[in-house]
Each structure stands twice: as structure tokens, then as C-alpha cells.
């Protein structure tokens, strides 16, 4: 047993002791757009595990959409037992509404991010527009598909990946601003979430390149349009860390804390990590990551803390009202 798993298993044991005598329980997981397939498999695995451990049947219901929009729904009263969103700022917004504590990231390993991803490009077979790196997305005549950063967490990662690449390469915020503005000038449609953008590109045939979560690009290539797409890995991208959290006010009111806590902790178990890897997320557990290493290309990654000083600062400067993104869109 690894040192990393001991506290998780101990917490699971404590959760079992705290379990109320209810034969069946339902949880709501409010998640972001492209996790549908991941949680469909994970929910079934956890339900089987939980019943074997406790005798209690658990049903997990899902809600999916753009991460920012989902966070607002929880703040507005959607009774999520757990949230599994695209970025920590969206869960911070739920904490600001006093639905969970501000130190929520300290409650699970790796700042409550059981898996990671990054941002890559999906192009049509043969790469007809010869897309190789971020600069190519701002070329005239290249139609770029990405969702709206105002509603989509994935879109915010996309935007920051492009900005961080340019700021690092050129050593200039002005050149980073120009590149990102050029990319968004080439965007014909801003869907509200990442899955909507995937559908626009894959099923509707719009655009030359999709800026996408790595897991979404791999899913599209392998399962949604086999033989129709290629993945282009840029020279540098951002380490995307989608976090998870318990919504304390809801679980305490619904008496679901024990099973909801176990649900999140099981994401860190070997089975939970294997499921994440099968659905193209980069697992945290080293042994699982090693088994799936060929699936995930090596790429130079920077973090939001390194390039932007964290989500609070990035959100205010780039995505707040009147911020960089609003000014870009106003100038289009």
C-alpha cells in the first residue's frame, strides 16, 4: 500500500462508520462539459464498490455544462452533493456563496485535483491548414473553434494556454495580447461549453482546428470520428487541473456527507485512476500513469501560478467584466 493511499483509505473507513442506516441514497455530481463518459463509468464502479462495502445502494445523477455556468447554477440553488469542475476559480465562487469552506482545496490530495489534462489542437486528417503551433491559429484564413471563456472553463484554459505560450516565447504581454486577439478574430462560433465546440467541429464540420482539452481531442479521434482527425501537440501548453469538492451545505442538509466524501476519495484509488486514464485524463497515481504513458505525449507545460499568479488574478485581468477578453471581443 502506498503512503499516498493510506489517508484516503482511513478516511473511507471513517466514512463507513459515519454512514446512516439508509438502504438507498442518491447523489448529484455537477460537472463540466466533457466528463460525461468518465463519470458514466466511474459512477457505476463506485456504486458497485460502495454497495459491497456497506450494503447501501447509491445512485449518482449527473449534470453537465460549461464550468462557469454550472458553478452559477449551484450558487443559485442546484443541490449538488459534489462538484467536479474545470478549474478552481469556479469552485471558489461556490465557496464565496458560503456553500463550502474557502480551504476546500486542502481537503484532498494534489489540491483536490485527482487527474489532470492539457490543451491541444484537433485538426482534420492530413492537417490541410498545416497547423503546428499557437501562432498558426492567428493566421488569416484559419477558422478556429473554441468555446466562450465567459461560460466555459475549458475555454479559459485554452485562452490562457495561448497567452502563456506567447508571453514566454516573445517575452512580451503586448505580443501575447496580439496573438490571442488574432486567434479569437478567427473564431466563427463561441459555444457555451467544450462539448458543444467538439460537436461544432466534429459533427457539424465547421472550422479548421479545434482547441480542446487533451482528453476531448483523444476521445474525438478514437471514438467520435475514427480516421477523420489528427491531434497536433503544440510546443508548449498549460497544465490543466480540474478540481473536485464536497458541497458542505448540501450534504449536511441531505445527510449524504459520508457517501459523497467517499465518492470523491475513490477517484484517487487505483480503480478510480484507471478509469480516469481510460477516458484520456492524465492520472495522478504514478503506477497508473506509467501503464498509460504511451497515450500521453510529452509536452512542455506551465502552470497558471507560474504564468498568471493563480486563478484569482487571471480571472480578474482576463475574464472579469471589462477585462482583456471583453476588450478583444469589443475590438473584433
Where is each model-derived feature located?
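Short helix-loop capping/hinge motifs at secondary-structure junctions, enriched
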Residues: 126-132, 151, 164-172, 250-258
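Extracellular/periplasmic juxtamembrane helices and adjacent flexible linkers that interface
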Residues: 18, 251-332
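N-terminal secretory signal peptides that target proteins for export/translocation
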Residues: 1-5
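Ligand-binding pocket segment of bilobal, Venus flytrap-like solute-binding proteins
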Residues: 169-235
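Bacterial N-terminal signal peptides
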Residues: 9-20
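Stable alpha-helical elements in mature extracytoplasmic
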Residues: 34-38, 42, 70, 87-90, ...
Amino acid at each position: 500500500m502506498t503512503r499516498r493511499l493510506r489517508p484516503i483509505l482511513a478516511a473511507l473507513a471513517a466514512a463507513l462508520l459515519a454512514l446512516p442506516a439508509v438502504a438507498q441514497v442518491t447523489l448529484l455530481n455537477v460537472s463540466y462539459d466533457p466528463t460525461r463518459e468518465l463519470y458514466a463509468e466511474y459512477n457505476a464502479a463506485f456504486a458497485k464498490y460502495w454497495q459491497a462495502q456497506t450494503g447501501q445502494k447509491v445512485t449518482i445523477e449527473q449534470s453537465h455544462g460549461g464550468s462557469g455556468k454550472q458553478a452559477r447554477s449551484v450558487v443559485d440553488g442546484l443541490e449538488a452533493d459534489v462538484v467536479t469542475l474545470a478549474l478552481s476559480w469556479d469552485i471558489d465562487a461556490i465557496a464565496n456563496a458560503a456553500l463550502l469552506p474557502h480551504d476546500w482545496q486542502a481537503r484532498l490530495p494534489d489540491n483536490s485535483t485527482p487527474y489532470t489534462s492539457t490543451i491541444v489542437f484537433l485538426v482534420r486528417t492530413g492537417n490541410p491548414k498545416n497547423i503546428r503551433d499557437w501562432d498558426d491559429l492567428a493566421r488569416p484564413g484559419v477558422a478556429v473553434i473554441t468555446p466562450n471563456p465567459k461560460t466555459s472553463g475549458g475555454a479559459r484554459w485554452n485562452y490562457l494556454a495561448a497567452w502563456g505560450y506567447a508571453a514566454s516565447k516573445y517575452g512580451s504581454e503586448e505580443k501575447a495580447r496580439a496573438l490571442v486577439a488574432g486567434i479569437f478574430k478567427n473564431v466563427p462560433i463561441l459555444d457555451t461549453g467544450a462539448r458543444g465546440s467538439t460537436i461544432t467541429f466534429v459533427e457539424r464540420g465547421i472550422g479548421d482546428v479545434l482547441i480542446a482539452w487533451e482528453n476531448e481531442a483523444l476521445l474525438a479521434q478514437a471514438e467520435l470520428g475514427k480516421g477523420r482527425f489528427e491531434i497536433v501537440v503544440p510546443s508548449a501548453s498549460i497544465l490543466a487541473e480540474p478540481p473536485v469538492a464536497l458541497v458542505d451545505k448540501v450534504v449536511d442538509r441531505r445527510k449524504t456527507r459520508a457517501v459523497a466524501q467517499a465518492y470523491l476519495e475513490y477517484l484517487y484509488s487505483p480503480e478510480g485512476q484507471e478509469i480516469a486514464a481510460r477516458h484520456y485524463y492524465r492520472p495522478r497515481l504514478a503506477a497508473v500513469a506509467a501503464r498509460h504513458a504511451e497515450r500521453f505525449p510529452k509536452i512542455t507545460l506551465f502552470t497558471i501560478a507560474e504564468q498568471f499568479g493563480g486563478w484569482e488574478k487571471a480571472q480578474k485581468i482576463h475574464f472579469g467584466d471589462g477585462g482583456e477578453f471583453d476588450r478583444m471581443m469589443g475590438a473584433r
